[in-house]
C-alpha cells in the first residue's frame, strides 16, 4: 500500500508541475505581447527580461498569488507611417517639381528641431515599481491642406495617468500623440485661425513660429470614368444601403428561399368561393377548351377538372350552410392520452400501476429462479469438491455439560466446589477430546487447493454426466454482473448497446411537436435541369387593417366589399325607449375589431367571444355584448359605413331600427346609443357605472315591491268550495266503466255505418254511368248490317237460370239471413247495392273500361233503363273482346266473356255477404241497461275482458 501511495503522489506532482509550467508559458506570452512595440523599436532586452522575471514572481501560483491583469501593460498597436510623398499631378511641370522639392528640403531641419523640443517636454510615467514609456506615433493624411495638417503635426503629447478604481483595476486615462480626435474639436480648430490655436497651446511658447514653413498642398486631377459604370455602382450601393437599413432599422425578420425559376415567388391572390362558383357556372373552362386553336396540354384539362371539383365542393358547402351544419369553429385538437405526460384518468393510473406490477412480478420471478439455481449449483459443488469450496468459518467447539457447569461456576464464584466433585480423569479426557476436534477443524480450514492441481470427487457414486462438466460451462443464472467479468468484445458491444427505457415523456412531447423547417434550407436537387433563384421575403406579423376587410376589388372590376355586411337580428322597436347604453372601453373596441377581421362579420360568434371575457361574474346592462350591440358599435367605429352596404334577409329590419334609434336620440336627451369611454374619462374604467346600474336595479325592485297590492288582514278568508261527493263503490265504478265502453262501441258502429252509406252511394253513381254507356252502345250495334251475334254463335248454356242479378242477390240474402228485417236493407236497396257492386267491378276489371269512361264523359246522362240480362252482358263482353282482338274467333270470345262474368259474380256475392253481415251483428246486440240502480243485473267486467275489448277496438279502427 505504501508503494501505491508513493506512485499516486508522484503522478499528481508531475501533473501539477506540468499545469504550472503551462501557466507560466501563457503568462510569458502575454508579457511579450504587451511589450511588442518596445521589441520592434529595438529596446533593451536585458531590462525587459528582468521585468519578465519580476512579473512571473508577482503572479506565482505556488505562493498563493493570483493573476493580476493590472500588472500587464496595455498593448497599443503602432500604426505604420503614411507615405509623406504628395501625389504628383499629371499637369505639373518640372519647374514646379523642383520648387516643391526645394521647399521640402528647407522644412526638414526645422521639423527635426521641433521634434527634439517636444521630446524634452515628455515626462516619463512613474509607477510603483516600474516605468512605462510611451513613444509618440505620427499620423499624416494624404491630401490634407496646410491649415489642417499643421496643428495635428504639432500637437504635444499628453501624459497618460493611471488611476486605481474601486474594484482594484487600473484604468488608463489620457491620450497619446497620434490618437484620433473627435469630430467636434477638429471642427473648432478649423474655424479658429492657426496663430490663435498655436498661442493657446503652452508647448508652442518654446518654439519660434517663424521657423515653421508651410508645405504645398498636393493637387489631384479628377480621372475620367465611364458614366455607365458609375450608375451601376451607385445603384448597387443604394440597394445595399437600403437592404442594410431595412434589415436593421425595421427590425423585421427575413427568409431566404431557394426555388426553381419556373415556380412563382408570389402567392396567388385568394378568390372567394362564390366568385369561383359564379365563373365556373357562367363561363366554364370545359367549354372553352374544344374551340381553341393552339396546342392543348394536360395542365389545361387538369385545371378544368379542378374547376368542376370546386363547383361540387362549393355547392355542398352551400347546402350545409342552409342546413346549419357548416361550422366556423375549428374542432379542438385530439390529445392522445398515451402521449400525455401524466395520466389524467383513473384508468390511466391503473394501467400505469399494472405495468409496473407486471415488470416487478416478472423480474422477481426471474430473481427467485436464479437464486434457486445458484443454491443448487453450490450444493452440487459441495458434494463434489467437499469442504474445499466452503468459505472460512470459525470452528465449532463441542463442549459437554460438565464444561458448561465449569463456566457457570466461574461466573458464580463456586469453581472450587465443582472441581473437587469432578475427578481428574474425566477432566483430562474431556480436554484431550476437545484438542482433537480443534486439530481436525484447523486442518480442514487450512487445506487449500492449488490452481494447477485437479480436484477429484470422492467415489461415492458415479454419474455419466460428469464428463460434460469437464468442459467448465458457465452458470446459466447470475444474480449480479460486473464490468470486469466481461470479455473485451462484449465490452465494445455493451458500449453501443441501446438501453430500453420505454416511451419517455420527453420523447412523446418531441414527437408531438414536429419543428417546421423550409425544405429549401436543407434540400437542393442536384439533378434538376432548371435554374434556381434566391428570393428574400420579409416576415410581417401585422394584423390586417380595419379598412382592408371592408373594401376589396370587385368580382370582376371596381371596388366592392369582400364580405357583404349581413346584420344580425334587430331587437324589437317597442323596447327602444327603455334602452340602456352600453359602455365600450378602448380594450373592448380593439378586441371587437380583431374578431371582426378574423371571423368576417359572423356576429353570433363575435358576440360569444367578446362576452366570454367577462367570466361568471355579474354582467350589467352596460356590459352586455349581444350580437346586435357588437354590430351597433361596429357601425359607430366604421366611418365609411353605409346603410346600402347591408345585405341579407335582416337588412331591412336593421335599417329600420337604426333609423328609428337615430330619430329617437334627437328627440330625447338621454343617451341610448353605445358610448365609448377611455381610462381618463371615468376613474377605474366603467366599474362605477356598473355598480350604479346594480343599485338602480335594486332600487327599482324595492319600489315595485312596495307598490304591489298587499292582502287585507281584516277581511275574512273565503272558505274553499269543496264539493261533498260520496265516494263511489266498486260496483258503481264498474257500472260506469261498462257504460263508457258501450258508448264508445256505439260511436264506432255509427262511424262505420256512415262510411258504408257513403261508399254505396258512390257505387250507385258509377253503376248508373255504366248503364248509360251500355244503352248508348246498343243502338249503334243494331244499326250495323251484320247479323246479330246470336245467329252466328250458338247460345251458351249458363250454369244458373237466366234472371236478373238483383233478384239473385235478394234471394241469396234471403237464404243466408232468414227472419232478419230490423237492420237489413230492403229488396230495392239490395238490388241497387248489387248493381253498384257489379258496375264497379266492371269498371275496374273489364278490358275496355278506359273507352267506357271516355264515352261517359261526352254523353249526357239519361233516364232510368231496364236491367240487363246475363246473356246480354256476356254478348257485350264478347263484342268488346273481338273489337280489341280481331284474331279471336267468336266461340273463343264467348268462352272468355262467360268465364270473366262468372268470376265477377262470385266476387260480388262475397262482397254482398260481408255488407249484409255487418248490420246483422249490430241488430243482434241486446239493448244497453238503464241508468237505474239495478246493479245486480250487470256483471262487472274482469281486467282480461277490458284488455280484449281494447285490442278489438284497435283492430276495428
From Swiss-Prot:
<dbReference type="GO" id="GO:0006281">
    <property type="term" value="P:DNA repair"/>
</dbReference>
<feature type="compositionally biased region" description="Polar residues">
    <location>
        <begin position="89"/>
        <end position="100"/>
    </location>
</feature>
<dbReference type="GO" id="GO:0003682">
    <property type="term" value="F:chromatin binding"/>
</dbReference>
<comment type="similarity">
    <text>Belongs to the EAF1 family.</text>
</comment>
<feature type="compositionally biased region" description="Basic and acidic residues">
    <location>
        <begin position="102"/>
        <end position="115"/>
    </location>
</feature>
<dbReference type="InterPro" id="IPR014012">
    <property type="entry name" value="HSA_dom"/>
</dbReference>
<keyword id="KW-0539">Nucleus</keyword>
<feature type="region of interest" description="Disordered">
    <location>
        <begin position="922"/>
        <end position="957"/>
    </location>
</feature>
<feature type="region of interest" description="Disordered">
    <location>
        <begin position="160"/>
        <end position="196"/>
    </location>
</feature>
<feature type="compositionally biased region" description="Basic and acidic residues">
    <location>
        <begin position="734"/>
        <end position="750"/>
    </location>
</feature>
<feature type="domain" description="Myb-like">
    <location>
        <begin position="576"/>
        <end position="638"/>
    </location>
</feature>
<dbReference type="GO" id="GO:0006325">
    <property type="term" value="P:chromatin organization"/>
</dbReference>
<dbReference type="InterPro" id="IPR001005">
    <property type="entry name" value="SANT/Myb"/>
</dbReference>
<keyword id="KW-0156">Chromatin regulator</keyword>
<keyword id="KW-0234">DNA repair</keyword>
<dbReference type="GO" id="GO:0035267">
    <property type="term" value="C:NuA4 histone acetyltransferase complex"/>
</dbReference>
<dbReference type="Pfam" id="PF13921">
    <property type="entry name" value="Myb_DNA-bind_6"/>
</dbReference>
<dbReference type="GO" id="GO:0005634">
    <property type="term" value="C:nucleus"/>
</dbReference>
<dbReference type="InterPro" id="IPR009057">
    <property type="entry name" value="Homeodomain-like_sf"/>
</dbReference>
<keyword id="KW-0010">Activator</keyword>
<comment type="function">
    <text>Component of the NuA4 histone acetyltransferase complex which is involved in transcriptional activation of selected genes principally by acetylation of nucleosomal histone H4 and H2A. The NuA4 complex is also involved in DNA repair.</text>
</comment>
<keyword id="KW-0227">DNA damage</keyword>
<comment type="subunit">
    <text>Component of the NuA4 histone acetyltransferase complex.</text>
</comment>
<dbReference type="GO" id="GO:0065003">
    <property type="term" value="P:protein-containing complex assembly"/>
</dbReference>
<feature type="region of interest" description="Disordered">
    <location>
        <begin position="72"/>
        <end position="115"/>
    </location>
</feature>
<protein>
    <recommendedName>
        <fullName>Chromatin modification-related protein EAF1</fullName>
    </recommendedName>
</protein>
<feature type="compositionally biased region" description="Polar residues">
    <location>
        <begin position="184"/>
        <end position="196"/>
    </location>
</feature>
<keyword id="KW-0805">Transcription regulation</keyword>
<keyword id="KW-0804">Transcription</keyword>
<feature type="compositionally biased region" description="Low complexity">
    <location>
        <begin position="762"/>
        <end position="792"/>
    </location>
</feature>
<feature type="domain" description="HSA">
    <location>
        <begin position="334"/>
        <end position="409"/>
    </location>
</feature>
<dbReference type="Pfam" id="PF07529">
    <property type="entry name" value="HSA"/>
</dbReference>
<feature type="region of interest" description="Disordered">
    <location>
        <begin position="703"/>
        <end position="804"/>
    </location>
</feature>
Amino acid at each position: 500500500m505504501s508503494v501505491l501511495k508513493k506512485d499516486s503522489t508522484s503522478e499528481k506532482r508531475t501533473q501539477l508541475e506540468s499545469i504550472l509550467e503551462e501557466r507560466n508559458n501563457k503568462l510569458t506570452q502575454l508579457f511579450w505581447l504587451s511589450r511588442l512595440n518596445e521589441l520592434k523599436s529595438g529596446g533593451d532586452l536585458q531590462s525587459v527580461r528582468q521585468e519578465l522575471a519580476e512579473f512571473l514572481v508577482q503572479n506565482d501560483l505556488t505562493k498563493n498569488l493570483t493573476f493580476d491583469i493590472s500588472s500587464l501593460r496595455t498593448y497599443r498597436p503602432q500604426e505604420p507611417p503614411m507615405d509623406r510623398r504628395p501625389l504628383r499631378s499629371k499637369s505639373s511641370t518640372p519647374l514646379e517639381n523642383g520648387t516643391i522639392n526645394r521647399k521640402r528640403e528647407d522644412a526638414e531641419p526645422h521639423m527635426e528641431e521641433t521634434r527634439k523640443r517636444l521630446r524634452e517636454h515628455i515626462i516619463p510615467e512613474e509607477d510603483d515599481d516600474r516605468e512605462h514609456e510611451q513613444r509618440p506615433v505620427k499620423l499624416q493624411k494624404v491630401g490634407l491642406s496646410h491649415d489642417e495638417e499643421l496643428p495635428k503635426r504639432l500637437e504635444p503629447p499628453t501624459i497618460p495617468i493611471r488611476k486605481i478604481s474601486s474594484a482594484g483595476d487600473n484604468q488608463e486615462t489620457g491620450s497619446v500623440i497620434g490618437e484620433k480626435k473627435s469630430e467636434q474639436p477638429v471642427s473648432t480648430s478649423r474655424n479658429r485661425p492657426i496663430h490663435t490655436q498655436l498661442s493657446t497651446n503652452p508647448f508652442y511658447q518654446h518654439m519660434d513660429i517663424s521657423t515653421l514653413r508651410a508645405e504645398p498642398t498636393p493637387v489631384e486631377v479628377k480621372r475620367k470614368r465611364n458614366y455607365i459604370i458609375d450608375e451601376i455602382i451607385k445603384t448597387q450601393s443604394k440597394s445595399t444601403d437600403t437592404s442594410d437599413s431595412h434589415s436593421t432599422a425595421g427590425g423585421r425578420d427575413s427568409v431566404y428561399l431557394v426555388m426553381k425559376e419556373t415556380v412563382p415567388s408570389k402567392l396567388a391572390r385568394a378568390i372567394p368561393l362564390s366568385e369561383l362558383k359564379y365563373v365556373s357556372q357562367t363561363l366554364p373552362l370545359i367549354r372553352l377548351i374544344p374551340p381553341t386553336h393552339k396546342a392543348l396540354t394536360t395542365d389545361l384539362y387538369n385545371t378544368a377538372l379542378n374547376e368542376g371539383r370546386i363547383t361540387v365542393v362549393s355547392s355542398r358547402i352551400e347546402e350545409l350552410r342552409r342546413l346549419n351544419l357548416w361550422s366556423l369553429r375549428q374542432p379542438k385538437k385530439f390529445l392522445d392520452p398515451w402521449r400525455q405526460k401524466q395520466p389524467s384518468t383513473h384508468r390511466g393510473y391503473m394501467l400505469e400501476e399494472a405495468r409496473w406490477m407486471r415488470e416487478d412480478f416478472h423480474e422477481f420471478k426471474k430473481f427467485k429462479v436464479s437464486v434457486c439455481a445458484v443454491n443448487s449449483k453450490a450444493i452440487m459443488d459441495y458434494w463434489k469438491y467437499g469442504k474445499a469450496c466452503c468459505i472460512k468459518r470459525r470452528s465449532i467447539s463441542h463442549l459437554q455439560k460438565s464444561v458448561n457447569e465449569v463456566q457457570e461456576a466461574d461466573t458464580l464464584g463456586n469453581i472450587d466446589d465443582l472441581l473437587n466433585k469432578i475427578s481428574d480423569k474425566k477432566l483430562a479426557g474431556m480436554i484431550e477430546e476437545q484438542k482433537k476436534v480443534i486439530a481436525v477443524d484447523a486442518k480442514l480450514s487450512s487445506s487449500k487447493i492449488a490452481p494447477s492441481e485437479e480436484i477429484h470427487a470422492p467415489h461415492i457414486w458415479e454419474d455419466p454426466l460428469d464428463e460434460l462438466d469437464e468442459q467448465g460451462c458457465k452458470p446459466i443464472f447470475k444474480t449480479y454482473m460486473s464490468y470486469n467479468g466481461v470479455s473485451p468484445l462484449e465490452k465494445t458491444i455493451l458500449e453501443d448497446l441501446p438501453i430500453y427505457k420505454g416511451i419517455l415523456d420527453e420523447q412523446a412531447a418531441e414527437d408531438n411537436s414536429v419543428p417546421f423547417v423550409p425544405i429549401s434550407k436543407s434540400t437542393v436537387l442536384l439533378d434538376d435541369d432548371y435554374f434556381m433563384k434566391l428570393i428574400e421575403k420579409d416576415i410581417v406579423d401585422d394584423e390586417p387593417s380595419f379598412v382592408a376587410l371592408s373594401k376589396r376589388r370587385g368580382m370582376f372590376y371596381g371596388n366592392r366589399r369582400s364580405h357583404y355586411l349581413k346584420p344580425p337580428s334587430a331587437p324589437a322597436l317597442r323596447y327602444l325607449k327603455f334602452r340602456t347604453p352600453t359602455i365600450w372601453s378602448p380594450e373592448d373596441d380593439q378586441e371587437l375589431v380583431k374578431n371582426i377581421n378574423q371571423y368576417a362579420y359572423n356576429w353570433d360568434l363575435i358576440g360569444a367571444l367578446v362576452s366570454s371575457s367577462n367570466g361568471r361574474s355579474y354582467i350589467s346592462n352596460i356590459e352586455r355584448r349581444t350580437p346586435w350591440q357588437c354590430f351597433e358599435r361596429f357601425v359607430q367605429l366604421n366611418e365609411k359605413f353605409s346603410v346600402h352596404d347591408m345585405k341579407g334577409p335582416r337588412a331591412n329590419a336593421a335599417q329600420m331600427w337604426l333609423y328609428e334609434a337615430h330619430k329617437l336620440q334627437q328627440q330625447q336627451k338621454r343617451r341610448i346609443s353605445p358610448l365609448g369611454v377611455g381610462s381618463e374619462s371615468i376613474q377605474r374604467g366603467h366599474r362605477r357605472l356598473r355598480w350604479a346600474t346594480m343599485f338602480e336595479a335594486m332600487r327599482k325592485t324595492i319600489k315595485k315591491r312596495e307598490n304591489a297590492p298587499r292582502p287585507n288582514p281584516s277581511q275574512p278568508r273565503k272558505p274553499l268550495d269543496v264539493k261533498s261527493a260520496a265516494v263511489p263503490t266498486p260496483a258503481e265504478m264498474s257500472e260506469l266503466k261498462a257504460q263508457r265502453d258501450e258508448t264508445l262501441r256505439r260511436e264506432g258502429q255509427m262511424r262505420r255505418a256512415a262510411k258504408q252509406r257513403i261508399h254505396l252511394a258512390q257505387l250507385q253513381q258509377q253503376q248508373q254511368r255504366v248503364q248509360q254507356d251500355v244503352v248508348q252502345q246498343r243502338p249503334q250495334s243494331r244499326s250495323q248490317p251484320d247479323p246479330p251475334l246470336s245467329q252466328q254463335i250458338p247460345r251458351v248454356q249458363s250454369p244458373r237460370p237466366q234472371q236478373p242479378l238483383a233478384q239473385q242477390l235478394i234471394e241469396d240474402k234471403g237464404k243466408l239471413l232468414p227472419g232478419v228485417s230490423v237492420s237489413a236493407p230492403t229488396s230495392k236497396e239490395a238490388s241497387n247495392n248489387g248493381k253498384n257492386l257489379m258496375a264497379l267491378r266492371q269498371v275496374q276489371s273489364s278490358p275496355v273500361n278506359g273507352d267506357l269512361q271516355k264515352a261517359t264523359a261526352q254523353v249526357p246522362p239519361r233516364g232510368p233503363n231496364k236491367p240487363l240480362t246475363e246473356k246480354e252482358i256476356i254478348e257485350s263482353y264478347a263484342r268488346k273482346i273481338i273489337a280489341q282482338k280481331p284474331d279471336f274467333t267468336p266461340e273463343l270470345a264467348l268462352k272468355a266473356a262467360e268465364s270473366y262474368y262468372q268470376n265477377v259474380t262470385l266476387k260480388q256475392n262475397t262482397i254482398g255477404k260481408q255488407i249484409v253481415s255487418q248490420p246483422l251483428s249490430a241488430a243482434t246486440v241486446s239493448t244497453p241497461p238503464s241508468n237505474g240502480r239495478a246493479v245486480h243485473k250487470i256483471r262487472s267486467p274482469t281486467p282480461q275482458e277490458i284488455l280484449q275489448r281494447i285490442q278489438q277496438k284497435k283492430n276495428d279502427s
